From Swiss-Prot:
Annotated organism of origin: Sulfurihydrogenibium sp. (strain YO3AOP1)
Family the UniProt entry places it in: Belongs to the GrpE family.
Quaternary structure and interacting proteins, as annotated: Homodimer.
UniProt superkingdom: Bacteria
Gene: grpE
Region (Disordered): 1-43
Function recorded in the entry: Participates actively in the response to hyperosmotic and heat shock by preventing the aggregation of stress-denatured proteins, in association with DnaK and GrpE. It is the nucleotide exchange factor for DnaK and may function as a thermosensor. Unfolded proteins bind initially to DnaJ; upon interaction with the DnaJ-bound protein, DnaK hydrolyzes its bound ATP, resulting in the formation of a stable complex. GrpE releases ADP from DnaK; ATP binding to DnaK triggers the release of the substrate protein, thus completing the reaction cycle.
Pfam families in the cross-refs: GrpE
Any single biological process term in GO: protein folding
Name of the protein described by the UniProt record: Protein GrpE
Amino acid sequence: MFVKQKSGGKKLEEKNNQENIENQEQNQEEVREEKPLTEQEKDELIKKLQEEVETLKQKLQKTEEAAKRLSALYQSIQKDFEDYKIRAIKEREQIKEESIEKFAKAFLDVVDNFEKALESFKVSNDINAIMQGIRMTHYQIMNLLQSYGIEKIEAAGEFNPMEHEALETLKTKEYRNNQIVKVLQAGYKYKGKVIRPAKVVVAISEEEEIT
């Protein structure tokens, strides 16, 4: 029984070897059967490769052209933005100059009236006339400021730290605690914004002081 198994294994090995030999012979035969390319086949292959190269060149050219267009567009936008900034600066300067010019023209009327009042002071001893000229000049100045959005801060009643600045305090029984007693310097607002607080004296009781 053992001898028969060994004989069968040997036959299998011989069969495998034979198949390997046949495969090798077949491969060699296929190699021998391969023929070199003909001139026509070579030309066709070269033509195909050239067409592929030309296609790639065209794609590259289109990409480069698109990049140039984007670069030109970017430069154009950048130039437009720089021009806009220059125009904006010039426009702001022009608006500023026009505002100053407008204010100056309006203020010249006040100056003219003030100079007339000064001339009248030289030739007149009428105190009432002098005071009337001063009041008129002051009235014109306040109207001019108001026309430009500048208004005087109301400095009466209770002290408001948002609009008033306490330079002094006064212990008194005539005013309630934290009431404005006196205005030392008028305050002003421009379009609702405090540009200078009113400097005031504030009343305090004996127990409390303004801080």
